[in-house]
């Protein structure tokens, strides 16, 4: 029997982001159909099968971008028409408990107009699996350094 991985979603007027939380995923299989059907399946770290199918709110393009990280897989799916969806799924019922809003990627309509990165897909894929920054937690305080050298 297969299990459902946690799925986080966010949108822009022209695309939908789906983040599948599945560490060390193998044998990833994805299918995007123009009428809005998105299907995913993969094997987890212990070989267990994870899968889900979503009937998305609107029509989508069959091409998608995928970024496989250590802990998750991020999909950027192009909408057929530029518009803001009122929800992720076509069904008006409450979504399954494994589907949640990705507040880290979420952008409201008015924020997108003001944002220069609204069409920049790269921003969704940057530092998703990074555990540390380049500065190794060090903070540079030039005023303290000046005081110490006096």
Curated annotation (Swiss-Prot):
It comes from the Eukaryota. Acts as a co-chaperone for HSP90. Controls root development through the modulation of auxin distribution in the root meristem. One of its GO terms (cellular component) is nucleus. Phosphorylated by casein kinase 2 in vitro. It is found in: Cytoplasm; Nucleus. Widely expressed but preferentially in the root meristem. Residues 112-150 are annotated as: Disordered. Induction: Inhibited by heat shock treatment. Disruption phenotype: Short root length. Impaired cell division in the root meristem. Keywords: Chaperone, Cytoplasm, Nucleus. This is Co-chaperone protein p23-2. Transmembrane segments: none annotated. Residues 112-123 have a biased composition (Acidic residues). One of its GO terms (biological process) is chaperone cofactor-dependent protein refolding. Residues 2-89 form the CS domain. The lineage of its organism: Eukaryota, Viridiplantae, Streptophyta, Embryophyta, Tracheophyta. It comes from Arabidopsis thaliana. Interacts with HSP90 in an ATP-dependent manner. Pfam families: CS. Belongs to the p23/wos2 family. CDD domains: p23_hB-ind1_like. One of its GO terms (molecular function) is protein-folding chaperone binding.
């Amino acid at each position: 029997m297969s299990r459902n991985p946690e799925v986080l979603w966010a949108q822009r007027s022209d695309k939908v982001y789906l983040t599948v939380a599945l560490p060390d995923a193998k044998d990833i299989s994805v299918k995007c159909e123009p009428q809005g059907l998105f299907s995913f399946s993969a094997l987890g770290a212990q070989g267990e099968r994870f899968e889900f199918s979503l009937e998305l709110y609107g029509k989508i393009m069959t091409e998608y971008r995928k970024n496989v990280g250590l802990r998750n897989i991020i999909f950027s799916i192009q909408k057929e028409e530029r518009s803001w969806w009122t929800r992720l799924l076509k069904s008006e019922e409450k979504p399954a408990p494994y589907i949640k809003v990705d507040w880290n990627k979420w952008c409201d309509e008015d924020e997108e107009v003001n944002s220069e990165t609204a069409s920049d897909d790269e921003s969704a894929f940057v530092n998703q699996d990074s555990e540390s920054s380049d500065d190794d937690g060090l903070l540079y305080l030039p005023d303290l350094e000046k005081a110490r050298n006096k």
